[in-house]
Amino acid sequence: CIKDNKIYSVEALLRFSYHTQTPLYAPMVIYIAKEKDLFEPLTKVIIKQAIKDFNKMLRENKDLKLSVNIELDLLCNENFVNWLVNIVKEERIKPKQFGVEITENSKFFNKGVSNYFEILHNNGINIYMDDFSMGHTSIIYLQDHLFDYVKMDGSLVVNLDNPRSKEIINSIIKLGETLNFD
């Protein structure tokens, strides 16, 4: 946070290199993992490593939060959701210290997703809408689904010198406050 120079939340990001100095870009790794039917196991490895690293960070900052991007297909998979809930419990992550991020461009207008969101909420796992306002249905998503946090898309905040951009951001912040988002 710029105001007090404190870190409040961290996000796990995929970085992968294999026998080279140059890392492979995350979208390429994800594409290959999906093609080889390894996407779910890869996601689990990423989450386990992120939680392991997060537990080390908690020694310095007990109030820290961790979020991980998870594709909606996995969050609509009962076995995966149960695994996620269990790993968070096993690692003794406090309720509301762990969250899943779903990008706004995810196609999540299906009836089942709300049930899985509810399971996550009931087990103290936060749900973030990532990249808010890039798509045309942002507001509808907020109306129909349970989110704890909204993360604005970076393209909104890069032009803060523009008065209209600033007003748009302020409006989104006011909307978030009205809907009790962090």
Regions found by a protein language model. Give the residues of each.
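Catalytic core of bacterial c-di-GMP phosphodiesterases, primarily the EAL and HD-GYP domains
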Residues: 7-8, 38-113
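Residues at alpha-helix caps and immediate loop-helix transition turns in enzyme cores, especially N-
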Residues: 25, 79-81, 112-113, 138, ...
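Conserved acetyl-CoA-binding loop-helix of GNAT-fold acetyltransferases
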Residues: 42-45, 165-171
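Cyclic nucleotide signaling catalytic output domains
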Residues: 4, 28, 32, 49, ...
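Conserved long alpha-helical elements within nucleotide-processing catalytic cores of c-di-GMP signaling
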Residues: 27-31, 40, 118, 166
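Short, contiguous acidic/charged loop-to-helix segments that flank catalytic cores in large enzymes
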Residues: 33-37, 41, 75, 158-164
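The catalytic core of metal-dependent phosphodiesterases that act on cyclic dinucleotides
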Residues: 87-160, 173-182
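Active-site core of bacterial EAL-family cyclic-dinucleotide phosphodiesterase domains
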Residues: 1-32, 69, 101, 129
